């Protein structure tokens, strides 16, 4: 008797959705051979049925109503790739209540509604999978869930936004200014027409919240994370960084401080990174995430953190996992809270070196006066560097 195929419902046929469809179609035989489970895409929900698409899809598969996916008793698994939060929330929660496992790559959705969605998943006994939500093609989610399960996570530090990293790399390596680097990123398809979430740090912040949730066993409100973007970084900052032996990267820093009431340090901000540090060599659209565990020590995950095919790879890994667990039941919620609420320390309570650049008059006693003012606030100076006055002559 031939085994009945798993039926998939795909919501969204944008960049990632088309990558998922193309890969499932192109590598169908390979995936069935490796998973030992037959499958087919039964229905695809899109916003506009008349839109021209580069990906050729049979018209009979398309609908502009996602309810047709969730309401179809023959569809076993829902793949949510529509983006945004409100409609995605309705789709995901409706699917979970209908007993259909969900695969999503929606970081904004999980950052905002993760606690509610994970709770519903557990209550309904219906799993949700989200490998593609943080790190694109980098398998960081499953690593935190499984490979590093015996570790207390001391810290997670990394570069998890390809757009900002491309811009900073262009500024640091080629001397480009911010605006020119952004325009180039947009021309190459590495930045959206509206790049706000990438350059203001909030795309990375959404991913950081998901990683912190998995690492420390408790959901965290987005308003607890300190976020600063790269919009105000200039080529001058790179000049001074290079002179001091650093480069500049937009880093996610998640660090646990034992025996403190607000124990979790959680921030996204541009940071000086020593030019000998491995993260300093992560350039262009590549991402890297360093995870330090008490048993495993330091680990590093590196790869393309976004894009059509890398993200599709992560989505499909979850689809295969969902198919296996659906066919051979073994409940998996994606995230089960196991710790009490963990307070997040205020950015003012963190201790870390900072780089500060002053534009001052070229006269005796200026540096001494700056040192005096900083000292009144208990701030010491580790190193100073001054540049010829012509560097700052245009402000």
Predicted regions and their residues:
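N-terminal glycine-/serine-/threonine-rich beta1-alpha1-beta2 phosphate-ribose binding loop
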Residues: 1-98
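Flexible, glycine/charged-enriched surface loops at secondary-structure junctions
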Residues: 38, 195-198, 219-227, 249-250, ...
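Rossmann-fold NAD(P)-binding glycine/threonine-rich loop
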Residues: 88-98, 105-145
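A short hydrophobic/small-residue beta-strand
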Residues: 101-103, 381
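Rossmann-like NAD(P)H-binding beta-loop-alpha module
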Residues: 122-203, 210
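Substrate-binding/catalytic subdomain of NAD(P)-dependent oxidoreductase enzymes
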Residues: 180-281, 286-288, 307
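Glycine-rich phosphate/pyrophosphate-binding beta-alpha loops
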Residues: 297-299, 303-309
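A conserved regulatory-domain signal marking ACT and ACT-like small-molecule sensing domains
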Residues: 314, 319-395
């Amino acid at each position: 008797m031939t085994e009945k195929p798993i039926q998939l419902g795909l919501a969204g046929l944008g960049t990632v959705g088309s990558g998922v469809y193309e890969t499932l179609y192109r590598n169908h035989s390979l995936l069935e051979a490796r998973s030992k489970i037959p499958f087919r895409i039964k229905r695809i929900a899109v916003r506009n049925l008349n839109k021209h698409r580069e990906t050729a899809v049979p018209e009979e598969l398309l609908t502009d109503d996602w309810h047709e996916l969730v309401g179809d008793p023959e569809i076993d698994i829902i793949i949510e790739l529509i983006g945004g939060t409100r409609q995605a929330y309705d789709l995901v929660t409706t699917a979970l209540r209908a007993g259909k496992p969900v695969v999503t790559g929606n970081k904004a959705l999980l950052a905002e509604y993760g606690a509610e969605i994970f709770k519903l998943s557990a209550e309904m006994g219906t799993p949700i999978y989200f490998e593609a939500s943080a790190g694109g093609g980098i398998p960081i989610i499953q690593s935190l869930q499984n490979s590093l399960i015996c570790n207390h996570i001391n810290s997670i530090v990394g570069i998890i936004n390809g757009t900002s990293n491309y811009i900073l790399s262009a500024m640091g390596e080629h001397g480009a200014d911010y605006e020119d680097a952004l325009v180039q990123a947009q021309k190459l398809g590495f930045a959206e027409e509206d790049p706000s979430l990438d350059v203001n740090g909030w795309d990375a912040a959404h991913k950081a919240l998901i990683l912190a949730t998995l690492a420390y066993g408790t959901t965290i409100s987005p308003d607890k994370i300190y976020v600063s973007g790269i919009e105000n970084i200039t080529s001058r900052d790179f000049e001074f960084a290079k002179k001091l032996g650093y480069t500049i990267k937009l880093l996610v820093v998640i660090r646990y401080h034992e025996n403190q009431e607000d124990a979790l340090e959680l921030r996204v901000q541009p940071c000086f990174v020593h030019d000998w540090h491995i993260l300093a060599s992560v350039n262009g659209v590549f991402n890297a995430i360093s995870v330090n565990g008490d048993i495993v020590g330091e680990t590093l995950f590196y790869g393309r953190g976004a894009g059509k095919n890398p993200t599709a790879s992560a989505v499909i890994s979850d689809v295969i996992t969902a198919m296996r667990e659906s066919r051979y039941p073994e409940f998996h919620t994606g995230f089960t809270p196991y710790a009490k609420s963990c307070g997040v320390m205020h950015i003012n309570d963190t201790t870390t070196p900072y780089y500060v650049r002053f534009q001052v008059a070229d006269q005796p006693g200026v540096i001494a006066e700056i040192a005096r003012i900083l000292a009144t606030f208990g701030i010491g100076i580790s190193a100073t560097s001054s540049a010829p006055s012509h560097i700052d002559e245009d402000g």
